[in-house]
Amino acid sequence: MGKKHKKHKAEWRSSYEDYTDTPLEKPLKLVLKVGGSEVTELSGSGHDSSYYDDRSDHERERHREKKKKKKKKSEKEKHLDEEERRKRKEEKKRKREKEHCDSEGEADAFDPGKKVEVEPPPDRPVRACRTQPAENESTPIQRLLEHFLRQLQRKDPHGFFAFPVTDAIAPGYSMIIKHPMDFGTMKDKIVANEYKSVTEFKADFKLMCDNAMTYNRPDTVYYKLAKKILHAGFKMMSKAALLGSEDPAAEEPVPEVVPVQVETTKKSKKPSREVISCMFEPEGNACSLTDSTAEEHVLALVEHAADEARDRINRFLPGGKMGYLKKLGDGSLLYSVVNAPEPDADEEETHPVDLSSLSSKLLPGFTTLGFKDERRNKVTFLSSASTALSMQNNSVFGDLKSDEMELLYSAYGDETGVQCALSLQEFVKDAGSYSKKMVDDLLDQITGGDHSRMIFQLKQRRSIPMRPADEMKVGDPLGESGGPVLDFMSMKQYPDVSLDVSMLSSLGKVKKELDHEDSHLNLDETARLLQDLHEAQAERGGSRPSSNLSSLSTASEREHPPPGSPSRLSVGEQPDVAHDPYEFLQSPEPAAPAKN
């Protein structure tokens, strides 16, 4: 029902025009008789009183009809339905809202008949409506992770992992778990687009399950559910499931539990006790399922760790090739690349390793490969600055020198052993002789007797008195060096020394004072040997080296030492021995047969 059309206006106009035309066709005539005379008076159209009377009557009738129509209209409006009135009020309210709303295009959605076109500026893009959800703007990785999150939440029908755990729910949770995680936090991170790959999502999912298994005991419901969800989630997000066409949700080990829980949660918000008992009653079956799939679970964890390592390497070293050496059965080496550009390839990327790939070509005129040792890269731990500073400030051996520190390292092995030994000795420094003896015995057992030998040599070095300067002779070789004279005879009381010290019985002291004539003979012999060495070097340096090893020149007769020379004689005058292993212990004085 709507408003009645005003058709009566057109009808009134037509009737009024007809009415105005009809009286003008034939005017009325009045005849008056006065005193026997007859007066005729014609009345015109504008002065006819009957015309005005008829017209006023017509207007009264028209006004009466208009009142009747208004009355009928008011009566009809009273009988309108309540729904129509409510609809009209809503339409009026919507119109008022459309007038006050901002220019975001809401008027077109409510009133399609009244369209207001607003042209946005060309340099500014049109903003989306705030009330509309931003589902259209989600990236493919977000949609994939949302699908994974929905699948994982179905495994948790009771919402154990839905919200963050507080100390009010689990006492002491914040003290045990330093990095909490739950499905709600993961969903917020998906919406905020904080996950750049599936690996990061898997890391947070594993963190959530590990937190549950760390806080709860293995016989609890939460521990078992976390273990189930962890296994199912890693299987669902594995590489084979992502790249394959099969649905991983259909291959899960417990397919009959999940649909039941989903139906019950749809019907009622709170799950019943029967469902909970059905879910967690067969504990033995649950344990057997997890035990039977332990290998698959470990495989999923290994694949996850490998994916994390590959992503980390590609992020820090893009385009780099890292790998390991693999030896084949025939003895050849292969370099297997770990972070290959195509990890899904059937064959792994390998490179053969041989001598030619590790070295350059031979230079002309040289028969061997050159090797240049960079001295700047050589660092010895015995003479480093940090070691000297850390070892000099101790209460057991104060003011250690470089040679004394070498003794310590030779006895205890490395810096850790030296620090441990010094710490033990400092601990029992003021405890008495018995405690010191126990520590010395312990260090001897650990070092195999090197501790006692080191202590003896260190005390011997520090107990030798220095000779005054006026007693030193000009020709005395000891006056220039000033080094202490060691007595090797003291080592004979240690039978467990690694070196053979039986030959020390025939020796006295290592250094003795030389006669004046013997020193001149030694100087002449040394000068002659140096001259021969200089001539031999000049002769060899002037010749061009051969390109083959077979054509190298042999040692000349001049280079061979004559028989009976001092270099051929040993301590016990044994000319048959080619090389004496204890040559460094010989006395500098010449042997008796040399004078003859």
UniProtKB/Swiss-Prot annotation:
Pfam families: Bromodomain, DUF3512. SUPFAM superfamilies: Bromodomain. Residues 543-555 have a biased composition (Low complexity). InterPro entries: Bromodomain (IPR001487), Bromodomain-like_sf (IPR036427), Bromodomain_contain_prot (IPR051831), DUF3512 (IPR021900). Residues 214-216 are annotated as: Histone H4K5ac H4K8ac and histone H4K5bu H4K8bu binding. The keyword tRNA processing does not apply. GO terms for biological process: chromatin remodeling; negative regulation of cell differentiation; positive regulation of cell population proliferation; positive regulation of stem cell population maintenance; regulation of transcription by RNA polymerase II. Residues 1-26, 38-137, 536-596 are annotated as: Disordered. Residues 50-62, 74-85, 111-126 have a biased composition (Basic and acidic residues). There is a cross-link at K372 (Glycyl lysine isopeptide (Lys-Gly) (interchain with G-Cter in SUMO2)). The record marks I169, Y222 as: Histone H4K5ac H4K8ac and histone H4K5bu H4K8bu binding. Its main location: nucleus. Gene3D superfamilies: Bromodomain-like. The modification Phosphoserine is found at S56, S565, S587. GO terms for cellular component: chromatin; GBAF complex; SWI/SNF complex. One of its GO terms (molecular function) is lysine-acetylated histone binding. The modification N6-acetyllysine is found at K372. Residues 136-240 form the Bromo domain. Keywords: Acetylation, Bromodomain, Chromatin regulator, Isopeptide bond, Nucleus, Phosphoprotein, Transcription, Transcription regulation, Ubl conjugation. Residues 1-10, 63-73, 86-97 have a biased composition (Basic residues). PANTHER family: BROMODOMAIN CONTAINING PROTEIN, BROMODOMAIN-CONTAINING PROTEIN 9. Binds acetylated histones H3 and H4. Binds butyrylated histone H4. Component of the multiprotein chromatin-remodeling subcomplex SWI/SNF called GBAF, which includes at least BICRA or BICRAL (mutually exclusive), BRD9, SS18, the core BAF subunits, SMARCA2/BRM, SMARCA4/BRG1/BAF190A, ACTL6A/BAF53, SMARCC1/BAF155, and SMARCD1/BAF60A. Interacts (via N-terminal bromodomain) with acetylated RAD54. Interacts (via C-terminus) with RAD51. Plays a role in chromatin remodeling and regulation of transcription. Acts as a chromatin reader that recognizes and binds acylated histones: binds histones that are acetylated and/or butyrylated. Component of SWI/SNF chromatin remodeling subcomplex GBAF that carries out key enzymatic activities, changing chromatin structure by altering DNA-histone contacts within a nucleosome in an ATP-dependent manner. Also orchestrates the RAD51-RAD54 complex formation and thereby plays a role in homologous recombination (HR). The Bromo domain mediates interaction with histones that have acetylated lysine residues at specific positions. Also recognizes and binds histones that are butyrylated. This is Bromodomain-containing protein 9. It comes from Mus musculus (Mouse). The gene is Brd9.
